[in-house]
């Protein structure tokens, strides 16, 4: 069972806590606008890049619309990471972007 968080709840946490956010969109999508503290880990290279992540850290995963972040979630969870999928993705992000 996936550990999901609504955009509303995520945004509230984002404004009150320091969260580690993985934006799994491709580089060109990320460059077009991203959550200021998000790290870019494109889904296409996640199978290699995941080794740079800390298994003792909780990660919030986001994509454009939420669908592909579920694939990243499944992969990272299978590797033993603590993952939370942000429902709705960047299409529903209410805050500012860089």
Language-model-detected regions and their locations in the chain:
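Rhodanese-like catalytic fold shared by cysteine-dependent sulfurtransferases
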Residues: 1-19, 27-58, 67-98
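Short, surface-exposed ligand- or partner-binding patches at beta-edge/loop junctions that are enriched
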Residues: 62
């Amino acid at each position: 069972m996936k550990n999901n968080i609504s955009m509303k709840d995520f945004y509230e946490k984002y404004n009150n806590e320091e969260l580690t956010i993985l934006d799994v969109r491709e580089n060109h999508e990320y460059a077009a606008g991203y959550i200021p503290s998000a790290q870019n880990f494109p889904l296409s290279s996640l199978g290699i890049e995941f080794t740079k992540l800390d298994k003792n850290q909780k990660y919030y995963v986001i994509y454009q619309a939420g669908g592909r972040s579920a694939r990243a979630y499944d992969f990272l969870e299978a590797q033993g990471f603590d993952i939370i999928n942000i429902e709705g993705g960047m299409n529903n992000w209410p805050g500012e972007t860089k």
